[in-house]
C-alpha cells in the first residue's frame, strides 16, 4: 500500500512516537510510506531511510501573509500532495492535523483515517470543535482510538466506523533481562509538561524520602518549554532536594536506564494511552499510575495484578503506593512480572498489522462504492 501519515512534526511526544514506529514498520514490510509534516523540530524521533518525509507546511515566503491566508495555504499544500501522489490512505494524528487532512481531502478521493491521541474532553469540546466535528468528521473514512473513553466522547456516526488499537512499542523494550538487584530509585519518563503533574510526584516523593532516605527520584524527559521545568527546578531547590530528586533530561536509551529501578511512578492528570507507561510495563517495572481520563492507564493496568492505580492529583495516595512497592518487594516483583506480559501484544509488527488490516478494509470499502 501507499500510506501517508500527517501530523505537525516529529518532535518527541506520544503521537510522534507512534507515527515513527508505525511508519518504520510499514516501510520495513515493503509499503511505500510518507510522513507529511508542517515543520521540523530539534528533538525529533528517527525515521528509516525508507520513509519519505514531505514538508506540507508554510514556506519562507508565506511568513508575512495573514492568518487566514496561511491557514488556506497549509490546506492547499496538503491537498496538492494528496492530488499528485494519490496515496491509498492518509492517517492524520492529533487535533489540528485531523481537521487539516479532512479538509484537504475534499476533491481528492483519498480516504482519511483520524487518530485521536489525547483526552477529548478539554481538547475537542471548544466552540470551534463543535462546528468542525459535525462538519468534518463525517468525511473520515475511519477513526482510530486508544481507549473506550476516547471513543465514547464522539457521536454515534464516528463510533460506528471506529476501532480501538493500542500504541506500539519499540522492540528494544522487549525481553530486557530482569535485574538481579534493583536500584533504590523511583523513576518516571515523559516530557516535562503541565498535564503530567510532575510537581505532585515530587511532592509525594519528598514524603517517601522521609521514610526511605536512601531512595532517589529520577525524572527522564525533554523540556516542553511550557514552564514546567522551571517549576520543578524551583520545587527541588525550595526543598533542598537536589541530592535525591533529579531531572535527567531526554534519553533515547530508556531501555537501559529504567529496568533496574524499584518503582515506576506515573502522575498524569489526563492522557490518551501513554507510550511511556506501556514501555515501563513491558520492561517489567513495578508501576504505580494515576487512573487518569480518558482511561489509558486503566486500559492496560489491572490494579493489584500488574500495577497499582491511584486517583489523580492525590499526593497521599501516590506516596502510600510508592511506599508499599518499596517495602513489599514480593508484591512489587509479582506486579512487575505480570506487567511484562503486555509487551508481546503491542510490538511494532503486531500493532502495524492491526493498522494494516483496518486500512485495507477502508481502501476496499472506498473502491467498492
Regions found by a protein language model. Give the residues of each.
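N-terminal strand-loop element at the rim of the active site
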Residues: 5-13, 17-19, 25-65, 153-155, ...
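Short His-centered aromatic/hydrophobic patch
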Residues: 92-98, 116
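Donor nucleotide-sugar binding/catalytic pocket of nucleotide-sugar-dependent glycosyltransferases
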Residues: 138-175
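Short hydrophobic beta-strand element within catalytic cores of glycosyltransferases
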Residues: 286-291
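Conserved acidic donor-binding segment of nucleotide-sugar-dependent glycosyltransferases
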Residues: 302-304, 308-315, 323-329, 344
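A short, well-ordered alpha-helix in the C-terminal region of glycosyltransferases
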Residues: 317, 324, 331-345, 357
Amino acid at each position: 500500500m501507499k500510506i501517508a501519515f500527517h501530523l505537525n512534526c516529529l518532535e518527541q511526544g506520544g503521537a510522534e512516537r507512534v507515527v515513527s514506529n508505525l511508519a518504520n514498520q510499514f516501510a520495513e514490510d515493503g509499503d511505500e510510506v510518507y510522513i507529511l509534516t508542517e515543520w521540523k523540530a530539534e528533538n525529533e524521533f528517527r525515521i528509516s531511510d525508507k520513509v519519505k518525509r514531505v514538508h506540507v507546511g508554510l514556506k519562507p515566503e508565506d511568513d508575512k501573509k495573514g492568518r487566514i491566508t496561511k491557514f488556506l495555504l497549509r490546506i492547499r499544500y496538503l491537498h496538492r500532495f494528496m492530488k499528485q501522489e494519490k496515496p491509498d490512505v492518509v492517517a492524520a494524528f492529533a487535533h489540528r492535523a485531523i481537521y487539516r487532512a479532512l479538509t484537504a481531502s475534499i476533491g481528492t478521493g483519498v480516504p482519511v483515517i483520524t487518530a485521536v491521541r489525547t483526552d477529548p474532553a478539554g481538547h475537542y469540546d471548544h466552540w470551534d470543535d463543535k462546528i468542525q466535528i459535525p462538519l468534518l468528521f463525517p468525511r473520515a473514512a475511519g477513526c482510530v482510538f486508544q481507549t473506550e473513553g476516547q471513543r465514547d466522547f464522539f457521536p454515534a456516526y464516528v463510533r460506528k466506523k471506529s476501532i480501538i488499537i493500542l500504541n506500539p512499542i519499540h522492540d528494544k523494550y522487549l525481553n530486557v533481562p530482569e535485574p538481579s538487584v534493583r536500584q533504590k530509585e523511583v523513576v518516571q519518563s515523559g516530557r516535562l509538561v503541565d498535564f503530567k503533574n510532575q510537581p505532585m510526584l515530587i511532592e509525594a516523593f519528598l514524603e517517601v524520602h522521609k521514610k526511605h532516605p536512601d531512595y532517589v527520584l529520577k525524572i527522564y524527559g525533554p523540556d516542553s518549554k511550557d514552564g514546567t521545568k522551571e517549576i520543578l527546578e524551583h520545587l527541588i531547590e525550595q526543598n533542598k532536594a537536589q541530592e535525591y530528586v533529579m531531572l535527567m533530561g531526554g534519553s533515547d536509551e530508556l531501555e537501559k536506564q529504567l529496568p533496574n529501578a524499584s518503582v515506576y511512578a506515573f502522575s498524569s492528570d489526563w492522557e490518551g494511552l501513554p507510550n511511556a507507561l506501556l514501555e515501563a510495563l513491558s520492561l517489567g517495572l513495578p508501576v504505580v499510575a494515576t487512573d487518569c481520563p480518558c482511561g489509558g492507564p486503566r486500559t492496560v493496568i489491572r490494579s493489584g495484578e500488574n500495577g497499582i492505580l491511584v486517583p489523580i492529583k492525590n499526593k497521599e495516595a501516590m506516596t502510600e503506593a510508592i511506599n508499599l512497592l518499596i517495602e513489599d518487594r514480593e508484591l512489587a516483583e509479582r506486579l512487575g512480572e505480570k506487567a511484562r506480559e503486555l509487551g508481546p501484544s503491542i510490538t511494532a509488527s503486531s500493532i502495524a498489522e492491526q493498522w494494516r488490516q483496518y486500512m485495507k478494509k477502508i481502501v476496499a470499502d472506498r473502491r467498492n462504492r
